[in-house]
UniProtKB/Swiss-Prot annotation:
Belongs to the Thz kinase family. The keyword Glycoprotein does not apply. It comes from Bacillus cereus (strain ATCC 14579 / DSM 31 / CCUG 7414 / JCM 2152 / NBRC 15305 / NCIMB 9373 / NCTC 2599 / NRRL B-3711). It holds the Pfam family HK. Disulfide bonds: none annotated. This is Hydroxyethylthiazole kinase. One of its GO terms (biological process) is thiamine biosynthetic process.
Length: 269
């Protein structure tokens, strides 16, 4: 997998304008929609159980995010996910805060048991808790612990039969056989709420147009990281408010040439 291949997926997303159905959380809905629009995808936020199955069936990808968890949303996620599976629509799952409470952890384990996932994305603590591996967590943003991130990612990919994505200072993408580390991004991303949730939806846009889900995820993470670096270079001294606005600009303006120039990936043995 080389940078030229990866950069082509960015162009394909913009040419295809994929419909991404998001069942996401109330904190990030606006930011997610704007980020997808800036990228060149078409977001839809449909949550009602009466319509989610139909909407999911016509989407390019379905993104399930359990950030602000309620029983009615879990029901909607299951309906949408099963419809997506029947209609060969890739499903992405963001198990926000898995491990923080018993209910949240129960849901985070139930969804992959019921729905076939194209990819799961979270920090190390979240992914570890989904597969019942011990990892310290405090709140929904915890991502540090004492385990091996690559090992956890590979185990999750194998157990859940999916592409596992663990994000942090370095990002890991694996299907259990191919494992790629992405070293793009900027620390200021952690100062803006919703950047992780938006990333999962961006991966959804890439998965909608590239059926090699490992390549799609690597392309999405590299693109997202480079866009954040370009935005930070212009705004980091001003603060996270200015960064957030410029980041949306860079999601629209970052090119395949930028990816080839600034992308940093490594395939592990």
């Amino acid at each position: 997998m080389n940078m030229k291949e990866i950069s082509k997926v960015v162009d394909l997303v913009r040419e295809s304008n994929p419909l991404v159905h998001n069942i996401t959380n109330v904190v990030v809905t606006n930011f997610t929609a704007n980020g997808l629009l800036a990228l060149g995808a078409s977001p839809v936020m449909a949550y009602a159980k009466e319509e989610v199955a139909e909407m999911a069936s016509i989407a390019g990808a379905l993104v399930l995010n359990m950030g602000t968890l309620r029983p009615e949303e879990v029901e909607a996620m299951l309906l949408a996910g099963k419809s997506a599976n029947v209609n060969n629509v890739p499903v992405l799952f963001d198990p926000v805060g898995a491990g923080a409470t018993s209910y949240r952890t129960e849901v985070a384990r139930h969804i992959p048991a019921e729905i076939e996932l194209a990819s799961i994305r979270g920090n190390a603590a979240e992914i570890a808790n989904v597969i019942n591996e011990r990892w310290e967590i405090k709140g929904v943003d915890a991502g540090t612990g004492n385990g091996n991130v690559v090992s956890i990612a590979r185990q999750a990919a194998d157990e859940l039969n999916t592409v596992a994505v663990i994000t942090g200072k370095e990002d890991v993408v694996t299907d259990g056989e191919r494992t790629i580390v992405i070293r793009n991004g900027h620390p200021i991303l952690t100062k803006v709420t919703g950047t992780g949730c938006l990333l999962t939806s961006v991966i959804g846009a890439f998965v909608a147009v590239e059926k090699d889900y490992v390549k799609a995820a690597v392309a999405a993470l590299t693109f997202y990281g480079v866009a954040s670096e370009l935005a930070a270079a212009k705004t980091v001294e001003k603060g996270p408010g200015s960064f957030q606005i410029e980041f949306l600009n860079q999601l629209a303006n970052t090119t395949s040439s930028d990816i080839e120039k600034y992308g940093k990936i490594e395939e592990l043995e």
